[in-house]
Design a protein with these regions (language model features):
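Acidic/His- and Gly-rich active-site-bordering loop/insert found
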Residues: 1-75
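Alpha-helical metal-binding/catalytic segments enriched in His/Glu/Asp
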Residues: 65, 75-104
Length: 104
């Protein structure tokens, strides 16, 4: 729930609107978590974050998952971030079980 604390509202939701300091804080936190999970991080010109877990076949097409880390002004705790964190949880589960994948 560390992410939910960033921009937490009195109503129990989150307010991390795009391009704000709170959005940056959430993005930095996610990048730290992804690096801790062994992912490489790339950020494109638009600010999209690509966290990549290496596969045994670097030429294979990657498995993709995506969502967003910013919220609407009255977004709930899981507005957007749920999909991002679900993908990171899959990576952490693969790592914890010692499972390698051919696709990045």
């Amino acid at each position: 729930m560390e992410m939910a604390k960033i921009g937490a509202t009195k109503a129990g939701g989150s307010n991390r609107q795009a391009l704000t300091d709170l959005d940056r804080e959430g993005r930095d936190l996610f990048c730290n978590w992804a690096r801790d999970a062994g992912c490489s991080i790339e950020i494109d010109q638009m600010g999209n974050i690509f966290a990549r877990r290496a596969g045994t076949d670097p030429g294979a097409s990657p498995v993709l998952a995506g969502s967003h880390l910013d919220t609407q002004p009255t977004g709930g705790k899981f507005d957007g971030v749920y999909g991002v964190l679900a993908a990171l949880e899959v990576i952490e589960t693969l790592n914890d079980s010692g499972t390698s994948t051919s696709r990045p």
